[in-house]
UniProtKB/Swiss-Prot annotation:
Keywords: Cytoplasm, Exonuclease, Hydrolase, Nuclease. InterPro entries: Exonuc_VII_S (IPR003761), Exonuc_VII_ssu_sf (IPR037004). Pfam families: Exonuc_VII_S. Its main location: cytoplasm. It comes from Geobacter sulfurreducens (strain ATCC 51573 / DSM 12127 / PCA). Belongs to the XseB family. This is Exodeoxyribonuclease 7 small subunit. Transmembrane segments: none annotated. GO terms for biological process: DNA catabolic process. GO terms for molecular function: exodeoxyribonuclease VII activity. HAMAP family: Exonuc_7_S (MF_00337). Its EC number is 3.1.11.6. NCBIfam families: PRK00977.1-4, PRK14066.1, xseB.
Length: 76
């Protein structure tokens, strides 16, 4: 995939959604747009997952010191 930046992929995904919601595309063009949207959504999800793994939270303990912890969502 030629897309390298999250922001670029997100913009393309938003454009695809707008086109599909417009209802003016032929069935063939709709399928092509949908396929492109799925690719962009997958790329964005991958980039967000990579970023999440890099994020660390700096938490203040009761004694005033700070501890670093990996970022985790509550459902993990």
């Amino acid at each position: 995939m030629a897309v390298e930046k999250f922001e670029t992929a997100l913009k393309k995904l938003e454009d695809v959604v707008r086109k599909l919601e417009g209802g003016d595309l032929s069935l063939d063009d709709s399928l092509k747009a949908f396929e492109e949207g799925v690719k962009m959504a997958s790329f964005c999800t991958k980039k967000l997952d990579e970023a999440e793994k890099k994020v660390e939270l700096l938490l203040k303990k009761k004694d005033g010191t700070f501890v670093r912890e990996d970022f985790r969502l509550d459902d993990e």
